[in-house]
């Protein structure tokens, strides 16, 4: 009789563990509700039509208007880029 009770309890624990694993794996990949992608400070970045270069005096030139130069690593050539939106500028934060 004692053997049957222990076997039953082991089986019950095993079923509970399997149920929890199955429940977790089903909910881990679910697409549930997400937070809205819209924020109070929305911003977009886009490339301008011009490129920029670094001169021998280490200053960047070639961008005009609201565009600024973006480059990778030590590269002396880059692309001009512009921010659009209501994101605060560095001057406003200081």
Swiss-Prot record:
Glycans are attached at residue 74. Disulfide bonds join 48-67, 52-69, 63-80. It is found in: Secreted. GO terms for molecular function: C-X-C chemokine binding. Residues 1-28 form the signal peptide. It comes from the Eukaryota. One of its GO terms (cellular component) is extracellular region. Keywords: Disulfide bond, Glycoprotein, Secreted, Signal. Salivary chemokine-binding protein which binds to host chemokines CXCL1, CXCL2, CXCL3, CXCL5, CXCL6, CXCL10, CXCL12 and CXCL13. This is Evasin P1086. It comes from Ixodes ricinus.
């Amino acid at each position: 009789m004692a053997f049957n009770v222990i076997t039953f309890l082991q089986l019950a624990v095993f079923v509970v563990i399997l149920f929890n694993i199955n429940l977790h794996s089903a909910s881990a990949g679910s697409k549930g509700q997400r937070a809205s992608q819209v924020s109070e400070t929305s911003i977009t970045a886009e490339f301008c039509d011009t490129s920029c270069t670094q001169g021998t005096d280490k200053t960047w030139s070639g961008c005009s208007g609201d565009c600024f130069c973006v480059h990778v690593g030590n590269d002396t050539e880059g692309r001009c880029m512009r921010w659009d939106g209501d994101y605060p500028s560095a001057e406003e934060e200081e």
